[in-house]
């Protein structure tokens, strides 16, 4: 795997932040409230999987993964109802 450029790292980290926000908002009921449970679950599952793949990359620098890891834990524990 080729290391990502600083610009790519920044873009990926920003995208991860969007996934963190979406997972958090769906779980809190602030996003996708009008969607059915399967749609909400699918959204959380996809974004959680994305974060798991991204956090596993080995070319991160000093970026904090605290919020990302919290969102992964929350997403993995989420069951839409």
Locations of regions flagged by a protein language model:
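Beta-rich interaction/scaffold domains
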Residues: 1-81
């Amino acid at each position: 795997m080729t290391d990502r450029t600083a610009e790519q790292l920044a873009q990926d980290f920003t995208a991860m932040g969007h996934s963190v926000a979406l997972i958090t908002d769906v779980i809190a009921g602030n996003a996708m409230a009008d969607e059915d449970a399967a749609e909400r679950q699918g959204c959380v599952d996809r974004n959680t999987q994305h974060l798991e793949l991204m956090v596993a990359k080995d070319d991160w620098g000093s970026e904090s993964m605290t919020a990302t890891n919290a969102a992964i834990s929350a997403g993995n524990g989420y069951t839409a109802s």
